[in-house]
């Protein structure tokens, strides 16, 4: 819990340290996997490298564990929740390509054949990630010469 509190309070260095201490105690468990995710999120916020390797170690450990009996439990990490964590880490780190790949996977895996969203909060955040990526992709196109018109608070074509 110390790592999670530090992470949510913006104390990222302390979150990394707490996650590493917790991982030393919670070896080969879902808690260990969740602490890897928290460490990765904190390191992404700090701009540190090595996130893909760290996430791969969490995925490998998760794959060795049996599927949780109650995946809806916040503290039980399952493969779908792990992909959501990975999406979040890559989004924070600015790796839009991987973030969008994970977001698409999470939406697919959390939507039933009849269209019911199994994890609405997760799906919503993934949609925000995809929308943000699309917005950036559109804004960065070479033909987009629109510049903010501060006088009118809108976009206008550049005349220069």
What function would you assign to each model-found segment?
Residues 1-160:
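Conserved binding/catalytic microenvironments
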């Amino acid at each position: 819990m110390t790592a999670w509190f530090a992470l949510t309070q913006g104390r990222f260095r302390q979150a990394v340290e707490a996650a590493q201490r917790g991982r030393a105690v919670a070896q080969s468990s879902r808690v260990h996997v969740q602490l890897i995710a928290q460490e990765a999120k904190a390191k992404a916020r700090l701009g540190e490298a090595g996130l893909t390797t760290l996430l791969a170690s969490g995925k490998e450990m998760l794959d060795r564990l049996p599927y949780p009996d109650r995946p809806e439990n916040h503290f039980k990490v399952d493969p779908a929740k792990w992909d959501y964590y990975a999406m979040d880490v890559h989004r924070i780190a600015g790796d839009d390509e991987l973030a969008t790949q994970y977001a698409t996977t999470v939406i697919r895996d959390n939507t039933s054949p009849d269209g019911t969203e199994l994890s609405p909060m997760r799906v919503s955040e993934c949609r925000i990630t995809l929308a943000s990526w699309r917005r950036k992709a559109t804004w960065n196109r070479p033909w987009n010469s629109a510049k903010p018109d501060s006088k009118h608070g809108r976009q206008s074509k550049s005349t220069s």
